[in-house]
Amino acid sequence: TAGLVSSVREQLDRLTALVRTLLEMSNLQSVSRTDQIALAPLVEEILTYLTPLAQKNNISLQQDCEELGMVGSDALIYRLVFNLVENGIKYNRPGGAVRVTLQQEKQTAVLRITDTGPGIPADCRESIFQPFFRVDKSRSREMGGVGLGLALVREIAVLHGGSVTVERSSENGTTFAVTLPLAQRC
């Protein structure tokens, strides 16, 4: 009976997460995008929050972030970075690492999240941004989530005039690159 209750609770949590994410995706266009966002402190805050998850999985977190700013929705950019770093932890190998770098390239901020996980097959590198797509369906239960995280990441990046791509992936890990327009200096 305890196992059944636990299973029902797990499914309810998963359904709640699905509904929450679907609502979030449907409301993206209406979110105000006028916040002044300091990206390096935002990355620091996310890494601090995710440190217990990383430690639980024996994953080291590293960062090298320039002080860059942009205008947009602070909550949405937080969610974008959070999803990518959390995925880097969840889909990594024990003893692995997640590295976040932020640098200016021309008039954009380029955020790279690199992990040391098993990589993403070449034929899946575009599909992973589609809602409900999973590279390894057999691991979806143990990983949790509903398969909307990367779709949400792409929507948020595009909504802010940016993009997200799989820049590199091999059996030694994956690098996601997010480009976002920098704030104009007055």
Short names for language-model regions:
Residues 6-15:
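Short alpha-helical segment of the dimerization/phosphotransfer core of two-component systems
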Residues 120-134:
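Short conserved segment of the HATPase_c
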Residues 95-107:
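Short beta-strand/loop element within the Bergerat-fold HATPase_c
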